[in-house]
Amino acid sequence: MNEQSQAKSPDTLRAMVAGTLANFQHPTLKHNLTTLKALHHVAWMDDTLHVELVMPFVWNSAFEVLKEQCSADLLRITGAKAIDWKLSYNIATLKRVKNQPGINGVKNIIAVSSGKGGVGKSSTAVNLALALAAEGAKVGVLDADIYGPSIPTMLGAEDQRPTSPDGTHMAPIMSHGLATNSIGYLVTDDNAMVWRGPMASKALMQMLQETLWPDLDYLVLDMPPGTGDIQLTLAQNIPVTGAVVVTTPQDIALIDAKKGIVMFEKVEVPVLGIVENMSMHICSNCGHHEPIFGTGGAQKLAEKYHTQLLGQMPLHISLREDLDRGTPTVVSRPESEFTAIYRELADRVAAQLYWQGEVIPGEIAFRAV
């Protein structure tokens, strides 16, 4: 231990680290890390500064930014030769719509919705779920798009069928680390679902409540597109924590996205923000970026309804090819720029869920990542 470090008490070291962290700013932080009480542990050993943070939402991508921006300052002011960073989670269980009772084992339900089909809602839901898992969370997906259940195909699990360990409940299908269920596991491609709204809604509620979900931090709910009876019924009856609305920059998609936001507001489901999908087409040959569906629409929509633009997702052939193969980009290309974008989206969604919500005491589980 050098003289500089000997002169520092544990309280002094902690104050130095806390002061540096207090200056760190990031889109996922409504308040700074010190105010959030994220600094869990500071220690000194063999000229190495050990810093552990505990966050109430997934934050791994932002954590990498923190290390990059703050390490040099901490080395300079503490005299340490190295820093050992550690991130752990206390994933918070947040208040559900209308204080409904939760689903056994599930902390938070995130509804992914769109006002119309064809905007990439399901692909966004799948990659968001995988990105949340990649950030360190326990995640599940329920495919509520009963008339077009595409999640099994996107996850390469279309040939699997759920089992019932007790004759009453279904065990979820595990795929790429996600616990999943879908009406697509129960019917063949040749059998179209012709149920009316009430029957479809009842079936989906049964799937949600009678699936033996493992302990999940986040359950991503891939909603049916549109704002009709079935969507309204699901939004009213499922204990959702928050909703994400997916759109494209195209004017007609934005019109329908408005309807989705208004629907959630009417049933008192917090809208976490908007995801602008296909915001930029990227040529696979030359890399040229072109906004073929227009620009700026989702940002204006977010401002009008006082919500967040959570992310702008590109349109690239590899994203489609990966889904067609049943190996979404987040798992098949973990180091790609597209995966980085989805992981940043996951951080923003989880953070917005936390900042907009109300923590339910006694429903927080500690877990290191």
Swiss-Prot record:
Gene Ontology biological process terms, A to Z: iron-sulfur cluster assembly
CDD domains documented for this protein:
Mrp_NBP35 (cd02037)
One GO cellular component assignment for this chain's record is:
cytosol
> Mutating residue 121 to A: what's the consequence?
Hydrolyzes ATP and can bind an Fe-S cluster, but cluster transfer is compromised
* The keyword Iron is assigned to this record: yes
Q: What is the effect of changing residue 286 to A?
A: Can hydrolyze ATP and transfer an Fe-S cluster
Gene3D superfamilies found in the cross-reference section: P-loop containing nucleotide triphosphate hydrolases
Q: List the effects observed when the gene is inactivated.
A: Mutants are impaired in Fe-S cluster metabolism. They are conditional thiamine auxotrophs and have lower aconitase and succinate dehydrogenase activities.
Annotated GO MF terms:
4 iron, 4 sulfur cluster binding; ATP binding; ATP hydrolysis activity; ATP-dependent FeS chaperone activity; metal ion binding
This chain's function reads:
Binds and transfers iron-sulfur (Fe-S) clusters to target apoproteins. Can hydrolyze ATP. Both activities are required for function in vivo, but the ability to hydrolyze ATP is not necessary for Fe-S cluster transfer.
The family database entries (HAMAP family) matched by this protein are listed as: Mrp_NBP35 (MF_02040)
Its family remark reads: Belongs to the Mrp/NBP35 ATP-binding proteins family.
PANTHER family listed in its UniProt record = IRON-SULFUR PROTEIN NUBPL (PTHR42961:SF2)
Name-wise, this protein is Iron-sulfur cluster carrier protein
Q: Which species does the entry assign this protein to?
A: Salmonella typhimurium (strain LT2 / SGSC1412 / ATCC 700720)
What are the top taxonomic ranks of the organism?
Answer: Bacteria, Pseudomonadati, Pseudomonadota, Gammaproteobacteria, Enterobacterales
